[in-house]
Amino acid sequence: MIKALFQIFGVIGVVLLLGCSDNSGSGNSDSLVNPESDETKSQRMRELLSDSVSYMYELSLIRGHLWVAKRLSMTGFLDHAAMHAKHPEDEIYSDLVEVFKAKGLRGFALELSAFSNSVVSGDQKAIEQDYRVLVDSVQVSQDLVELTTGELLELINRLISQAAREYAVGIIDGQVDNVHEYQDARGFIEIAMNLTRNHEQQSDLSENHLAVIGLLKGSLEGLLEMWPTLVPLGEVPFDASRLFGAAADVEILSLSL
C-alpha cells in the first residue's frame, strides 16, 4: 500500500514543493548577501541546539561538499576540488562553532583545514588520509544524534530540496551554467543516501518503517543518473524539477509512518 501511495502521488511532486520544509541552512546564498544580526545568530544557535534535524542538516551539507572535493581531487580536477574543500570552512562551519562548545564537542576545524590544504597541494596520499580522519571527526559530532524515521525523512527532504535549488542554478536547458552548484547537488544526494542506508541498519525498525526506508533508498538511487559525470563537457539531459518532485515524494512517504 505504501508503494502504491508513493507511485500515485509522485506525479504531483512539484506542486507539493510549497509544502516542503523551510530551510535557512548555510547552503542558501541569501545568507551571503544579508549579514546576520547578533539576535539572528543567537536564534540560529538555539535552533541548532534544540532541533536535531537542523543540526544534522548543517553537518550533512559539510559532508556533501567534502565528498565532492574528495571525488574531484581523485580524478585530477584539483581546482574544482579546492573550491568544495574550502566551502565548509569558509561558509558553514562558523555556524557550528558555538554549538559544538555547548554540546561539549571539540569540533573538527583542524581536520577541515588539513584536508583543504591537502587538496590544494594535490598530494593524493595526503588527501586520502586527511579525508578519512576528517570524516571520522564529523561522525563524532553526528553520533550524538539518533534520528527517528520521521526525522530522517525531514532531513532527506531538506537535502533533496537544497540539491534541487543548486541543480536549478547549475543546469539550465540541459546545459551547464554553474558546474560548482551542479556538483554540490550531487554531494547532497550522496549524503542523503548514506544517511538512509545507515538508518536502515537499525535493528528496532518496524516493518512499516523498513518499507518506507526501502522506497526512499530506491528513489535516491534513481536520481544518480542526473549526474552522468561531475565535470560534464556536453549536454546534461535532466532538469531540477525531478529533484523538486523527489523532495515532495519524501513528504508523502512521511504520511505513511
Where are the predicted features?
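Bacterial N-terminal signal peptides that target proteins for export
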Residues: 1-9
